[in-house]
Amino acid sequence: DIKNGGKLSKKELKEKEGNLILKSLKNSDYVILLDDKGLALTSIEFSELLNKNMVSSANELVFIIGGAFGFSESVYRRANTKLSLSKMTFSHQMVRMIFKEQLYRAFTILEGEKYHHE
């Protein structure tokens, strides 16, 4: 959370949040934004994306949820990929829960467990 964020314009708030996000990243991080304008993947396709990036790279995967007004342009430029969980808008709490479940599902798919059904 940004101190006194309520006093800032949407653009100023996105810029401030963006600066904090960018400061926390390493140059080697593979950044995936959770964004409603991103790629819409099936659970299997998402597991393949995870697997490809975990196997082919020493970089850390970093998933980022945007603020109330989305991401700053600088964060969009830094991102390697944008991923959509839905075209709908969800609260941060809901995104965390839905995304955690998709991560769990993806790893069970990769491990060949019977959690996911086609």
Language-model segments: which ranges?
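Generic beta-strand structural signal
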Residues: 61-63, 81
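Rossmann-fold NAD(P)-binding glycine/threonine-rich loop
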Residues: 66, 72
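Structured adenosyl-cofactor binding patch, chiefly the S-adenosyl-L-methionine
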Residues: 73-117
